Amino acid sequence: MRKRQPVGRSRKSSLWKAVLGAGALVTSLAACSGGGGGTVINLYGGASGIGFEKIIADCNQQAGGRYKIVGNLLPSDADGQRDQFVRRLAARDSGMDLLGMDVTWTAEFAEAGWIRELTGDQKTMATKDTLGPPVQTATWKDKLYGIPRTTNVQLLWYRKSLVPTPPKTFDEMMSMSQQLKSAGKPYEIGLTAAQYEGYVVNINNLVTAEGGTIVNSDSSAPTVDDKTVKALTLLHRLATSGLTSSSMSNAQEPEVFADLQAGRSAFSLNWPYVLSAMREANPKLVDDLGFAPYPTVNAGDTPKVTLGGMNYAISTYSKHPNEAFEAGMCMRNEKNALSAALDAGDVPALATVFDRPEFIKAYPMKDVLLTELKNAVPRPVSPVYQNISTVLSTQLSPPAAINPQASANGLRSAIQAAIEGKGILP
C-alpha cells in the first residue's frame, strides 16, 4: 500500500477523468513528437508527488538528451490507477513506458505478461542496497518484475499532551480513548474504513494481529477461520464503540489525517507521511505529535502490519525498455529517494537512505519503521488479488454492520468465488 497513492489521497471524480483524458492526449502527442525528435519515456504513477518535478528534472539532466522523462497524471487512488493501467496494457498501448505500481499488482501484471522481468545486470542493480521486504513485493514466482522505489508500514500516531504513554494493544488504546472522552478531551481513534484498498489494509492488519491469514500460501483457497472471527469482532467493536469518528465508514487517509490535524483525534493509525504532512498543515501540532509501533491484539506480541509501497515496472509494450529502466533507477537513486522522503514523506526502499543524517533528522521514527518493516506482512499475493480485495472491502462494509461469525462465513465463500473469478469485475 503506498501512502496517499495506493490507498488513496482523494476519491475519484469526473474532474479526474477529464484531467486524465487531457493528460493522455498530451502524452500521445509528446510520444509522437518526441519533444523535437528525442526519445520520450512516459512515466505513469507517482509523478504528481510533492517535489517530484525536480526529481524528473534531475534525471532528465543526467540523461544528457538521450531521452526525456515525461510524468503523466493518473487518479490519486489505487483503484483508479489500476483501472487505467489494466485498460491500456490490455490494449497493448506502447505509450506507457515506466509504471509506478502498487505493490499488490505485481503478480497480476506479471502473470498477464504486461511487465518485463528484470534479469542479469538489471536485476542486480535493482536489488543492490535495497531492503528485503520491498524486493519481495516486486517478485513473482521467484522472478523480479520491478525496481523497488518506496515502502510503507502504518504506525500509531498520538497526541503526547493527551497520551503520555502510548498504548501497546488495541484494548489499551480503547480504554485510554474512553477515559479521554469521559474527561471531555479529544479522544477519537482515527482509522480508514471506507470501501476501498485502505480498508483492506486495516482488515489485513487485524487478521494478522490475531495470527491469521486471509488466503493460504499460494492464494488458492481462503483461510477464514476463528482467528478471522476474532479480528472481525475487534473491528466491529471499534466501529460501534463511540470512540471513532462518526464518519469512520467513509474515511480514507485524508479524512483520518484531517481529524488529527484539527485536534479531534487522540490516536491515529496512518502511514509515515503524517509527520511531514503535519509540518506543512499544522506546525504548531508537530511538537505534540508522538509515534509508536502499531498496536497489537495481545500484550507482548510483535506488531505485524501490512506492507505497502510502490515499484517501477517496465511495460512489455514499451519501445524503449532500456531507457525506461535507466530512468527508473535514476528516480529512485539515493539522492532522489532522499529528496522524495524529505519532500513527500515517501519511505525509501533503499537501505542506504536510512543512514543519511538528513533522513534521520526528518524521520525520528526511523527505528520503529525498520522494526515494523522487518516483520511486515503482505496482502494476499495473487494474480486475482483485486478480486480478493474487492470482496473484503464490500463484504465487510460498513464495519458497524459486521456480524463476526456470519460475516466470516460469507467472506469464506465470497473469497473462494473471487479466486475462481466468479462474479467479480476485473
Language model segments and positions:
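Glycine-centered hinge/linker elements that transmit conformational signals in sensory
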Residues: M176-S177, A183, S219-S249, Y294
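Hinge/lid segment of periplasmic solute-binding proteins
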Residues: V103-V153, E172-M174, A292, K361
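Conserved N-terminal structural module of periplasmic/extracytoplasmic solute-binding proteins
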Residues: R2-A107, N298-G300, A417-P426
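Short helix-initiation/N-cap motifs at beta->coil->alpha
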Residues: L73-Q84, T104, D171-E172, S247-Q261
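A structural signal for short loop-to-beta-strand junctions that line the ligand-binding cleft
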Residues: V86-R87, G95-D97, M125-Y158, D301-V305, ...
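Conserved C-terminal helix/tail region of periplasmic/extracytoplasmic solute-binding proteins
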Residues: R2-K3, T371-P426
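Extracytoplasmic/periplasmic substrate-recognition and gating elements
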Residues: T240-L243, E280-A344
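Short, solvent-exposed loop/beta-turn-alpha elements that line the ligand-binding surface or hinge
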Residues: G120-T130, G190-A193, E210-T233, E280-K284, ...
